[in-house]
Structure formats: structure tokens, C-alpha cells
């Protein structure tokens, strides 16, 4: 390849004149290249331009390029993963740190004979604390601190990820009735969390008003086999305490209706179960007043939970509640995601 061939080499990248004139695309590209100063090299520089290209293609470079083309493509290099590197430190190099820590509180960690310290460099006063002996933190101490800091962070993160995150449900913004986890299972509150100071007495008519009696009422949920949900757009109160059954199956208990919504508790003492759904331990819903399953209303912004609480007196809704609980069993409808 000589300098006389430079014109022919440049012509390889150009179209014939008649095709260039007839092609609007080539004209647009040429205009764009001229605007950005990306045109072809001038005629005066053709000799130097071709000479540089010829000189760069020497025999050694050509062999290297040919050899690389024959080789298999290299594996893509992974990005640096801090968590992976930390796990390697925890798993593979743990014995080094244990050996370093168990050296009778003296920094005798020998790393390529560069950090060996004699006992003469340490303070001989036994009353001085070990942390006060070396004011200057060396590389080994810094490495140890980094290890334990990362180890405790990893352990704390593992404990947090192992436990289910809890969302505390509050009713009337005055008491936590139960704990519902992200796995949508209702957990029983321990006995220490129950409100023992809350007196269980028959409520007066003034306490039936959700705006008056709920401010001082604190109820806890006991039995998880008979949870009732009132899902209605008319309901404005998100709190309800009601209709109870003990763990032994004895339904002859009074109902604390101080937190029951107005649309559930009627003036005649009869309970309207048209908008009340039963939730069993598997979080399956079924209607109480009708045997057909009912899904919660999608227009309502919340669901009212009627939890059970034990009282000493009976009310008029006892018999009706007992019959409804015994008569209607939950049917198969999709689970309610709380």
C-alpha cells in the first residue's frame, strides 16, 4: 500500500456523483457532517492521513489483533459488590481476627513481619486501661474495628429481616387492638399487652355514641375464631368492640357495644348484620345475615373490625349472636388482604 493509493482508498467511502445527487439521505448526512465539522479530510492532507493509517498497521499489531479475534470472548467483569466482599471476610478470614483478638490484649499480630511489636513499646502501668495504652490506632486495629462494625451490622440486618414486620392497627386512635403482619396473619396479643385497667361494665346510652364513649374506651381482642368485619361506605367510625365468645365455646357472655357503629346497633336493641362479615382464623369472609358469601365493598375506604371482649352482663343481642355464629360457617371466597 503506497501513497498513490490514498485517493482510491478515500473513494471507497464515497458514493458516485449521480447517486449522491439523487439521494436526499446522503445530502442530509453531508449537511450534518459539515455543520459539525465531521467532513472528509481535505485533499492536501490525504497523503499524511493515509500514511498514518498505514504506519499504524504494522506486523506486530496485526498479529495481536488476529490473535485476539481467535480467542474466546472474555467474561464480563463483575462490578464490585460490597456485601459479597464482606461475606467473604466473615466466612474466610474469621480465624485471623479470632487469633488477633486472643493474643492476651497485646498487638502481636504478625503480618509479613511488618507490624511486629515488642513488649517494650507498651506501657507497663497495669492500672491503665487497654484502650489507653495505644492512642494511635494502627492498621490492624482499624481492620479489627471495621470487621466488628460490619459483623454487627450484618447480624442486626439479619435479625430484622428474620422477624415479620408488624403494622399496629389503631381504632379511634386510642388503643392498639391487634397486630397484623405483612404476611396477613392476625397475631394474638400477649397477656401483658392487654389493658387490665379497663373496667368491663355495662355501658350507658351516652357511651354508645362513637364520638363520646370511644375516647376513654380501651378494648383488647381475645378470641380469634369469631372476628366480625363491617364493610360499608356509610360507616364513619373505624372502631368497634363487640360480640364475644370465650375460648371454651361458651357464648353466654355479655356484649360490650360501646364501640359498635350506629348502623350495626339499632335503637330497638336488635343487631343489623347485613353489613357485617365474619372472618375466621384463615381470614376468610362470610356474611352473617345471609348465607351467600359477600365481598367487602370496594368503595369503602376502611373496614370496621368488631372485636370480642368479655363482660359480666348479658344484653338482648346474645341469643341472636349465638344463633348467627352457630348457623353460618365461612364459605370459600378470596382472602381479605388487610
Curated annotation (Swiss-Prot):
InterPro entries xref list: AreA_GATA
Q: Which GO terms describe its cellular component?
A: protein phosphatase type 1 complex
* Sample GO molecular function, one term: protein phosphatase regulator activity
Residue ranges for the region (Disordered) are 1-21
Kindly name one Pfam family recorded for this protein.
GATA_AreA
Q: Biological process GO terms, please?
A: cellular response to glucose stimulus; regulation of cellular response to glucose starvation
- Highest taxon in the source lineage: Eukaryota
Q: What does this protein do?
A: Regulatory subunit, binds to type-1 protein phosphatase. Functions with HEX2/REG1 and SNF1 protein kinase to regulate growth. Might regulate SNF1 directly or indirectly.
What protein name is recorded for this chain? Protein REG2
Amino acid at each position: 500500500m503506497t501513497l498513490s493509493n490514498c485517493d482510491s482508498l478515500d473513494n471507497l467511502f464515497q458514493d458516485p456523483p449521480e447517486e449522491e445527487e439523487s439521494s436526499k439521505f446522503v445530502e442530509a448526512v453531508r449537511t450534518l457532517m459539515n455543520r459539525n465539522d465531521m467532513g472528509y479530510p481535505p485533499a492536501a492532507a490525504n497523503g499524511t492521513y493515509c500514511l498514518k493509517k498505514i504506519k499504524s498497521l504494522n506486523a506486530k499489531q496485526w498479529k495481536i489483533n488476529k490473535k485476539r479475534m481467535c480467542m474466546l470472548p472474555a467474561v464480563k467483569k463483575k462490578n464490585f459488590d460490597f456485601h459479597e466482599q464482606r461475606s467473604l471476610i466473615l466466612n474466610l478470614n474469621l480465624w485471623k481476627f479470632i487469633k488477633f483478638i486472643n493474643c492476651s490484649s497485646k498487638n502481636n499480630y504478625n503480618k509479613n513481619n511488618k507490624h511486629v511489636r515488642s513488649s517494650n513499646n507498651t506501657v507497663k502501668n497495669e492500672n491503665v486501661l487497654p484502650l489507653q495504652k495505644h492512642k494511635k490506632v494502627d492498621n490492624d486495629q482499624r481492620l479489627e474495628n471495621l470487621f466488628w462494625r460490619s459483623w454487627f451490622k450484618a447480624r442486626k440486618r439479619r435479625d430484622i429481616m428474620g422477624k415479620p414486620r408488624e403494622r399496629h392497627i389503631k381504632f379511634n386512635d386510642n388503643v392498639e387492638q391487634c397486630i397484623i403482619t405483612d404476611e396477613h396473619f392476625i397475631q394474638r396479643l400477649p397477656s401483658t399487652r392487654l389493658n387490665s385497667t379497663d373496667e368491663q361494665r355495662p355501658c350507658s346510652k351516652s357511651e354508645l355514641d362513637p364520638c363520646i364513649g370511644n375516647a376513654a374506651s380501651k378494648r383488647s381482642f381475645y378470641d380469634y375464631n369469631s372476628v366480625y368485619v363491617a364493610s360499608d361506605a356509610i360507616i364513619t367510625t373505624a372502631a368497634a368492640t363487640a360480640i364475644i365468645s370465650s375460648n371454651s365455646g361458651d357464648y353466654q357472655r355479655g356484649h360490650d357495644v360501646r364501640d359498635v357503629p350506629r348502623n350495626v346497633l339499632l335503637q330497638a336493641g336488635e343487631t343489623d348484620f347485613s353489613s357485617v362479615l365474619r372472618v375466621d382464623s384463615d381470614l376468610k369472609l362470610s356474611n352473617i345475615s345471609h348465607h351467600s358469601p359477600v365481598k367487602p365493598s370496594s368503595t369503602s375506604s376502611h373496614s370496621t373490625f368488631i372485636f370480642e371482649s368479655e363482660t359480666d352482663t348479658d344484653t338482648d343481642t346474645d341469643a341472636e349472636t349465638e344463633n348467627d355464629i352457630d348457623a353460618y360457617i365461612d364459605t370459600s371466597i378470596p382472602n381479605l388482604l388487610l
